[in-house]
Amino acid sequence: MSTVPQIALVGCGYWGKNLCRNFHSLSALSAVVDATEIGHETARSIAPNVRVTKSFDNILADDQIHGVALATPAETHADFAFQAMKAGKDVFVEKPMALTLDDANEMKQVAHETNSILMVGHLLEYHPAVLKLREMIASGDLGKINYIYSNRLNFGKVRTEENALWSFAPHDVAVILRLIGEAPVEVSACGGS
């Protein structure tokens, strides 16, 4: 019988509470790290038997924890990911992966060097409609795809720590890349207020 890998969730706020619920329902949640008492209360209300702490270092030192899920502010993703991978943990990081291309490339390099799994939470890639579209494109049912238009609605929470591109575009870009399976030749964008 296989054992379920144990995950520590870092951040139990706006989006982290959803990850807390999901990992707990899978019996994969071993601990929750959050800097705030509100985060602790949220974690305990969702997963009452799970360890809740403010210490990320204790999580890194725990050999029973196989990976960490990062649901912290975007500007902290790279640092938490580096620490976790260097401690031998796999990392699931919410979007955006990082706020700079240099940080993203370094995260990828550290994952390679430490033989760690580094996964970004592009949840829309697994949506049934996206999977069906991918199947239709692969089978040729839609012909050759020359152009894709994306329009973002339902913006959700407005964030001040990252710009609109980092906040909203990662899911759209991830879905398009997954559907097409190749890099775009040209990209254009416009915005307004």
Feature annotation, model-predicted:
Residues 47-110:
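Beta-loop-alpha module in the N-terminal Rossmann-like domain of NAD(P)-dependent dehydrogenases
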Residues 1-47:
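N-terminal Rossmann-like dinucleotide-binding module
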Residues 75, 98-159, 172:
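A contiguous active-site-proximal alpha/beta segment in oxidoreductase catalytic domains
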